[in-house]
């Protein structure tokens, strides 16, 4: 089974090169969404969690970055520990874990597990970055030569010839990433990753 996830953080990391264990460098998470597909790519679980703010205030910049309103956050926010435990339960049901820009998403998420002192199985799974694996498929020219990594909005537009809304919202992004993964998988663009199936 496949778990596709996306999270929204309240800001950018201080540095993308530092490990997630440096929790001062990695931002807090405000929104986590994931979808689990069975071997036939049919959804069997669909989770969407807004996280209640802990140690920070919701600013207009955060609202814009996460595409969530302060009212929604206050109404729907859940304790971080509850969300982290629910995600790890989802991990236990999956063999493959995917995300667009996996390194960013997994580091934000893993830093939260460290902060809460909760064990998890994320790094014990086969993990795949949809952004990196779709680079040759998209063939978007880089300014420095070769191809650049596509954003999820670019990948979605190339596959489906249309945009989705609102980008940068974890819920919308994970739906888009799941649609793109299914299209690429069914189009045999990812066969080298799953040749044991």
Predicted regions and their residues:
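Extreme N-terminal starter segment of soluble prokaryotic enzymes
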Residues: 1-3
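Short acidic, Gly/Ser-rich segments with clustered Asp/Glu that frequently serve as metal-coordination loops
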Residues: 7-16, 20-22
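Metal-dependent phosphoesterase core characteristic of DEDDh/y 3'-5' exonuclease domains
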Residues: 15, 26-68, 88-197
């Amino acid at each position: 089974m496949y778990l596709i996830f996306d999270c929204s953080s309240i800001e950018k990391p201080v540095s993308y090169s530092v490990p997630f264990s440096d929790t001062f460098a990695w931002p807090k998470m405000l929104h986590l969404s994931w979808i689990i597909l069975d071997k036939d790519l049919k959804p069997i679980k669909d989770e969407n969690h807004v996280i209640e703010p802990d140690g920070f205030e919701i600013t207009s910049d955060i609202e814009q970055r996460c595409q969530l309103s302060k009212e929604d956050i206050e109404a729907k926010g859940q304790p971080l520990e509850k969300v982290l435990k629910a995600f790890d339960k989802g991990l236990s049901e999956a063999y493959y874990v995917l995300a667009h820009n996996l390194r960013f998403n997994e580091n934000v998420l893993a830093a939260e597990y460290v902060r809460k002192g909760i064990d998890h199985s994320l790094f014990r799974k086969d993990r795949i970055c949809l952004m990196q694996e779709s680079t040759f498929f998209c063939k978007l020219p880089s300014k420095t030569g070769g191809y650049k990594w596509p954003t999820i909005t670019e990948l979605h537009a190339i596959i489906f010839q249309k945009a989705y809304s609102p980008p940068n919202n974890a819920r919308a992004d994970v739906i888009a990433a799941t649609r793109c993964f299914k299209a690429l998988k069914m189009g045999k663009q990812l066969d080298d990753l799953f040749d044991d199936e």
